[in-house]
Amino acid sequence: MYNRFVLNETSYHGAGAVKAVAEEITARGFKKAFVASDPDLIKFGVSKKVTDVLDDAGIAYEMFSEIKPNPTIQNVQSGVEAFKASGADCIVAIGGGSSMDTAKAIGIIIKNPEFADVRSLEGVAPTKNKCVPIIAVPTTAGTAAEVTINYVITDAEKNRKMVCVDVHDIPVVAVVDPDMMSSMPKGLTAATGMDALTHAIEGYITKGAWAMSDMFHLKAIEIISKSLRGAVENTPEGREGMALGQYVAGMGFSNVGLGIVHSMAHPLGALYDTPHGVANAIILPTVMEYNAPATDEKYRDIAKAMGVEGTENMSVDEYRKAAVDAVRQLAKDVGIPADLKAIVKPEDVEFLAQSAYDDACRPGNPRDTSVAELAELYRSLM
């Protein structure tokens, strides 16, 4: 048995790193950039921090902003046509997971036109060619899409999210600059931060976990637990910590997969447009309780990484409870709702459960589950 580990060719970290965007484009010989960013980031001047760098370097670019939260097949199709018309030879993706996921899908289809039907990319797509080179500049500290081989596109006709896994979609360069994240409001900071914690915890206990991924996930849990409260208050230390912590979590989970927290969160985004991080944060503690019997001593490690003292002297039940309690407390401290009562309609539970069971993240869960058990988990959160 052997394991594969895929990362960016190059990554930049720290305040001011955004300057590296122009340096990389020039060094790689690209002539024109296709800049993919959502309308709000353009409206509030966040994307301008990157395009100013391009302007100063005399690099030609074309903007594409037809991107919505939980990006759709239509967004991707529009992007493919816009890219073809642009004459660009690289993509600069600015934003959170929505911008980067859209950019990945566009880049894959451009280089693998036989997959022009976006639905054909669901699951592990057998593409043959690397996507258009992507330079990814995250503006949120959560999805880690800048370092993952995953992307998620919403099929609006079927009210479902498609998880796509493709080693050919990883950005060649990640530029992780905490200054690009400083304009995030508290609610978005909290939601994306809890998404990052979910990545780290699910990645640590997933069936595919191994020594190398464990190393990244435990460190990510530690960094995020120390940094998220400060990031919500917009402290420089908190922002910098979350920028690093979410990236480290991405280094891990991208290579080993996730579990049913994400499986349950994806249908909520597709059906109700629930922010992905909020859905994960609400679901995580309950699923941790459900998964506990299948995690050996890993919850002891999680509790310790989150700052719980005395874990070495705790019983199995005690350290498992301590880990779950630490997650619940962090979510509460940053203002995450405690349940799904305001989101889920009772008549939708069976559809949600079936969608969660069919989701690509479900097989990696440490505890095998069923549609009925997933339905019960949803109900327990209502």
What are these regions (language model features)?
Residues 18-21, 43-46, 73-76, 99-103, ...:
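Short glycine/serine/threonine-rich phosphate/pyrophosphate-binding segments
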Residues 42-115, 229-239:
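N-terminal small/polar loop signature for handling phosphorylated ligands or for N-terminal nucleophile
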Residues 299, 309-382:
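C-terminal charged capping/lid subdomain of soluble metabolic enzymes
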Residues 1-64, 381:
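An N-terminal, well-structured beta->alpha segment
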Residues 74-179:
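Glycine/threonine-rich beta-strand-loop-alpha-helix active-site module
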